[in-house]
A protein has these predicted regions:
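Alpha-helical scaffold/interaction cores of sigma-54-like transcription cofactors
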Residues: 1-617
Length: 617
């Protein structure tokens, strides 16, 4: 291909793009692109999946973002920033986090960036300006709204200011005073106003960049994208009206020989191929505000104490199997020391001890019971070598350590973290999180964002609501979805099918395999096709139920942040699995209602009888 896509919105521009990251990268690889960008609206949520998938296909990922620019009087236009290097990447994180800060995002849910504050964050960033919502468009036309809505090139030519070049130069000079690299760009679009503006730019400027504003891959997505936008407008009048134009938004319809496409390589030449993956930022654990410098040695000390309490003072280990225990402990300690994650266990142990010290119930579940060190530290209540103490020791009954931690995943650039789920009473969770914040610093601890997605049945119901509102859509959708096979029963088959086609989902499987669903598909093809395209796309923001990131440094320097109305605080604007790729250390502290009830029952009984222990309920 003779060009680089530099202005691309994926599904992480929530409800404004049908472009799934898998689908995007797959298309890039098929068409032979060597580099491409991701530039979602006011966020970089998709940077990790895009980076990883692009790298896997041999495509250079360009990290960027489209920002809404404001001044004291309101919205003024949009710019697109691309990261030249790691410095620019860090600066973009800071800019996006400021745009979505409590002071701005809380007011009306809109991200706001001010040019006056960008000078200190401009290093390492490329600025692109010139699309439909930019100050270039607004300043070039005498009546930009009329030009935007016009279907006549002749009318738009009349509306184009005679001094449009001077007006554009004023906009460019304003941004050139902040950024070293500023490029004027325009869309090759069927929109008359953009065609007129594009011709004017080509006539007056040599250094411009053709840069279409991509929102989807397939032409079939045009009406789907249009319906999503119109549905938002119906629910929220504040959502911008957007006119959909084939050549402007659709990646697959851009020609292989894109006009002046080689000019995009002038931008690519400025961009380094830098890495964003980071090792775990585990805080140094301390006791009584004193940092313990040798985390490995302190973990050994804690393990010795646990061994003494459980197996010397407590239940004796049969002499014949002592070597099994000592060998397992040595092996686990060595693995954690090599991975440099000893501090992780010290932090979890400290949290557990704090909760127990408050007289509250706490439990860990899942694979952590396969770790002997977790048992020695009282994180887990199960001895993995003798999980059933009523039975004699047997190698076959051991809980495998590999189920808990697979050291084979570690390499020179990546260290996997353990996954210990800690369950606590919901009423105590805020207090526990406050303890963690006070110990490691409020700027170093944050919740994580999560996103609800259009799932199979829900996607179909949403499609009926939008496309067939006049019909009895709810009853029809319910009748159809009751015929669906439980997704859990075919999960392995779906994984195999998705390896060949990432967009394959539960709706298509039911159409292909359930005859009664196929009949409904023939009757409501438009609705089903809409549902298939939105299936798995993110739609709403929420807060991860358990995940908490604890770092050795202020999180705002390493992760994009956003305001959460639910918590009334800043949270990390990247999903949990992606946060770990960027060096985040996740601790799962889940409020479990059943635990609360068991604890209340214990207290009620003990008020009368005083012999029940929570751990025996």
């Amino acid at each position: 291909m003779n060009y680089v896509p530099l202005h691309v919105h994926t599904c992480w521009s929530l409800l404004d793009s049908t472009l799934d990251v898998d689908e995007y990268v797959s298309h890039l690889a098929t068409k032979g692109f060597k580099a491409a960008a991701i530039t979602d609206h006011n966020n970089i949520k998709g940077l990790v999946p895009f980076y990883k998938k692009a790298k896997a296909k041999g495509i250079r990922p360009i990290i960027g973002c489209e920002l809404d620019m404001w001044n004291l009087f309101g919205f003024v236009g949009r710019i697109t920033l691309l990261c030249k290097n790691k410095t620019g990447y860090k600066n973009l994180i800071a800019i996006v986090s400021m745009a979505r800060s409590i002071e701005r995002f809380k007011v009306d849910g809109r991200a706001k960036t001010y040019l006056t504050e960008l000078s200190q964050y401009s290093e390492g960033l490329i600025c692109l300006i010139g699309d439909l919502r930019s100050e270039v468009f607004t300043n070039a036309f005498a009546n930009p709204d009329m030009a935007y809505n016009s279907d006549s090139e002749e009318e738009c030519s009349i509306l184009l200011k005679k001094n449009h070049k001077e007006e554009i130069d004023l906009v460019l000079s304003k941004y050139q005073a902040v950024f070293n690299d500023v490029f004027l760009f325009f869309d090759y679009s069927k929109l008359p106003a953009l065609k007129v503006l594009g011709n004017a730019i080509k006539t007056s400027y040599k250094d411009y960049v053709p840069c279409n504003n991509i929102h989807y891959v397939k032409k079939e997505d045009i009406p789907i994208h249009d319906l999503i936008i119109k549905d938002q407008e119906a629910q929220d009048p504040a959502v911008d009206d957007q006119r959909i134009f084939l050549a402007n938004y659709c990646l697959c319809h851009m020609p292989e020989k894109f006009p002046d496409g080689e000019k995009t390589f002038a931008v690519l030449d400025l961009i380094e191929d830098f890495a964003i993956e980071e090792p775990p930022m585990i805080p140094q654990f301390g006791v009584k505000d004193q940092i313990i410098l040798d985390q490995d040695e302190y973990l050994k000390i804690c393990c010795r104490k646990g061994y003494s309490d459980k197996f010397i003072k407590g239940n004796k280990i049969p002499e014949a199997i002592k070597c099994e225990y000592t060998e397992r402990i040595r092996r686990e300690l060595n693995i954690f020391q090599q991975a440099k994650i000893s501090g992780y266990f010290l932090i979890v142990r400290d949290i557990v001890n704090y909760v127990k010290g408050r007289g509250l119930p706490i439990d860990s579940r899942g694979s952590s019971s396969g770790c002997l060190i977790s048992y020695l530290l009282d994180i887990s209540s199960i001895d993995p070598l003798m999980p059933d103490p009523t039975l004699d020791y047997s190698k076959d009954r051991e809980l495998p350590f590999e189920r808990f931690y697979n050291e084979g995943r570690n390499n020179a650039t990546n260290v996997s973290l353990p996954d210990i789920d800690v369950d606590v009473p919901p009423s105590a969770r805020p207090e526990i999180i406050d303890y963690i914040r006070n110990k490691y610093g409020h700027e170093n601890v944050a919740h994580i964002i999560t996103h609800s997605r259009f799932k199979g049945k829900g996607a179909l119901k949403e499609a009926f609501r939008i496309i067939k509102p006049a019909e009895n859509h709810f009853e029809i959708a319910n009748e159809i979805t009751k015929l669906f096979v439980d997704e859990a029963k075919i999960s392995d088959e779906l994984v195999e099918l998705q390896e060949e086609d990432p967009s394959y989902g539960i709706i298509r499987w039911n159409i292909d395999n359930i005859q009664s669903v196929k009949k409904f598909y023939d009757q409501y093809k438009e609705v089903f096709d809409f549902a298939i395209r939105i299936e798995k796309l993110p739609k709403n923001e929420s807060v991860h139920a358990a995940g908490l990131i604890v770092s050795d440094r202020p999180l705002k320097n390493s992760f994009p942040m956003t305001y959460s109305p639910k918590l009334d605080q800043m949270i990390i604007d990247v999903e949990g699995v992606d946060v770990e790729f960027l060096g985040g250390v996740k601790f799962d502290i889940l409020g479990v209602a059943a635990l609360e009830k068991a604890y209340q029952i214990e207290r009620m009984i003990n008020e009368k009888l005083k012999f029940v222990e929570y751990g025996r309920i």
